[in-house]
Each structure stands twice: as C-alpha cells, then as structure tokens.
Amino acid sequence: VDPGTQVGPDRLVNTVAGFDLHGGDLIVVDFGTATTFDVVDHDGAYVGGVIAPGVNLSLEALHQAAAALPHVDISKPQRVVGTNTVACMQSGVFWGYMGLVREICARITAERDRPMTIVATGGPCPAVPAGRDVVRRLARRPDDARPDRDPRT
C-alpha cells in the first residue's frame, strides 16, 4: 500500500479475520455500502484493494436519479430478461454485480499470478449464492468464525 495511505478499519478487520480463517493469497469481498475487494498475500500482509459502489447504493441511485424508477430491494431474479421495471432493475444490478465480482476477482488473480481464495461478507452477501463458482466462502453469521469449526471444510 502506498506510504501515507489510509485503509478503512472495516477493511483491515475483514482481511485480518479472513487471513485467520483461510490463510493468505486471499481476496475478501465485502458487500456493504461500497463493494470492496481486499487482497492479502501469502504472508498475511495487506496488499491493497478495489472499491466499487455497493449493491444497495446502486439500486438507490437508480431510484433517486430516475423519477420513474421505484425503490427496489436486491434479490436474485427468476430470469435475466425482466418483464417489468422491478424485475429489470433487480436483474441489472444482481447479474451486473455477479459480473463485477467475477471480473475483478479474475483480474486480481491474474495480477497476483497465483491461485487466490475468495471469501465474501456483508449485508447483501446471502443474496449472491449464484456466485459460488467465484466466491468460496460466504461469511454470513458471527458463528461462522467459531474456533471449533474448521473453516476449510
């Protein structure tokens, strides 16, 4: 990380917990207000990351910026091609974020030139099980980090 650069404490906590549970060569994806991607090397050092608008922020921005678009909650749409405004918005954001996660994780992995473990956390995280081919672990509950549980199973 560049000297003098600040990293949010939430991002550092995510990477420390991720490293403790899964070891290094890690990408932690946090679906919060912002969707962040934080990278930890094989020794546990924080490398850097990516910040993108969050899922809910994107939906809210559509609602705020376009008067005709309603407030919509994120959920996995039944189809990619929506047949009404709500379904179209959900599809655009849901599948758009699946693409965002896949592409950013693929590019980080290529840049690091080594296999990476990818874990996810955050509010809308349970809404993205379709991304299980990319995200290896979903840290949804505090008890996911129980010391008596082997995180690699």
Give the predicted meaning of each segment:
Residues 1-27, 41-153:
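Nucleotide/phosphate-binding catalytic cleft detector across ATP-hydrolyzing
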Residues 38:
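A glycine-rich phosphate/pyrophosphate-binding beta-strand-loop-alpha-helix module
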